[in-house]
A protein has these predicted regions:
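Alpha/beta-hydrolase superfamily serine-hydrolase fold, recognizing
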Residues: 1-263
Length: 263
């Protein structure tokens, strides 16, 4: 595989499943060993597509990042921990192909929103899901659910329907099995640069879990994550704003990626 600066490469296969496809957006400027920024879309574990966030691919390339938008397997056909496994598979593909896309294999920053953030959180914070050579420059989590067991036990307070149209297709119907998938309760990764963001008009359960994850990482695991409150944004608008005149999110995110790449 060979690519030129400024190219857009669609549907590169990073695995055998039909959903194992990614799009690559490369900067127009000359250079090599650029930061690699990966964005995993949302969709409540059951839907979503990389093309829905093409704005982020274009934005990242303009910022000078090799920007990667993957699809991943969806529920109910594929259940926990398939999403996290796909995050790891994308990472492995990028490590193997970094030189061909002008990226730095040591400067991979993984990011996601909503369900995509949940998958990135699991892959980066739960060591049992990682290969022995796992290494990333950082991760950014936007408006994600990180504790499905809490959501299951507090459905009434959070206003979540029964049956749960989002969690049950991915985690199953037995709450007893949701504990193993609750990232908040099973963090065992060594600290790395991490940004946790939630929106002012986010779903209440997302706001609660952002704070819960932040507190647990700081108090028990030695992390020093950045915490960002996205004023005037809702669950969907933060990702949609990247590449627009609204730079309230993109400015913070670009600066974070550059700090991660600088080490």
């Amino acid at each position: 595989m060979s690519m030129r600066d400024g190219a857009l490469r669609n549907d590169e296969a990073y695995g055998a499943h039909p959903r194992h496809r990614l799009d690559l957006y490369l900067p127009e400027s000359e250079g090599s060993e650029r930061p690699i920024f990966v964005w995993f879309h949302g969709g409540g574990f059951v839907r979503g597509d990389k093309q829905h966030r093409a704005n982020i691919g274009a934005w990242g390339a303009r910022e000078g990042f090799v920007t990667v938008l993957p699809n991943y397997r969806l529920a109910p056909a594929c259940r926990w921990p398939s999403g996290a496994e796909d995050v790891v598979a994308v990472w492995a593909w990028l490590r193997a192909n970094a030189q061909h896309v002008g990226g730095d294999a040591e400067s991979i920053v993984l990011a996601g929103e909503s369900a995509g953030a949940a998958h990135v959180a699991a892959a980066t914070l739960m060591r049992r899901l990682q290969p022995k050579d796992w290494n990333i420059a950082g991760a950014a989590l936007l408006s994600g659910p990180y504790n499905p067991l809490l959501e299951g036990r507090a459905r009434t307070q959070f206003g979540i329907a029964t049956p749960d149209p989002r969690n049950e297709p991915y985690f199953g119907t037995d709450l007893a099995g949701w504990d193993a998938a609750s990232v908040v309760d099973h963090v065992d990764a060594a600290p790395f640069p991490l940004l946790i963001a939630y929106a002012e008009r986010d779903l209440v359960q997302m706001q609660v879990q952002a704070g819960e994850l932040f507190a647990r990482l700081v108090s028990r695991h030695g992390f020093d994550p950045e915490l960002r409150f996205l004023s005037a944004h809702d669950h969907f608008s933060a990702g949609a704003s990247l590449g627009t005149e609204d730079t309230s999110v993109s400015r913070e995110l670009a600066a974070f990626v550059k700090r991660c790449a600088a080490g």
